[in-house]
Amino acid sequence: MDTLSYKTVSLNKATVQKEWVVIDATDLALGRLASRVALVLRGKNKPGFTPHVDCGDNVIVINAEKVILKGDKMTDRVYVRYTGYPGGQRFTTPREILAKRPAELVRRAVKGMLPKTRLGDMIIGNLHVYAGPEHPHQAQNPREIKLNEI
């Protein structure tokens, strides 16, 4: 490159290079884990970050059942959903969610940290959460990253 270019190069769908990464959630605080995962999903850790393009990596979170919540958050925090019927509000605690579907707890925390737009809906599709240490994505050759390396 002999001349300087003063144009900002934005990524697009064709030029984005996505990787697969694995994050082990064992003994990690839910909020800290979710914020780092959201950062990688969005692509903000890459130098070519473009806000309107899905330029993040595909993230696999394993051992979601071993995530921790500090203090009394296991029992005091309440997740609310609505069935659509009168009087249909349903309340659940993280302890109940962790007992039934541990992956849902991590997925819900990460989704809350992504944009509330169509792009955010696309990005959450790049998140794969599994309760145990096994995952079916070995063919993608994911690289393992530690939480403090992001």
Question: What is the meaning of each model-derived region?
Answer:
Residues 106-107, 111, 124:
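Hydrophobic, well-ordered secondary-structure segments
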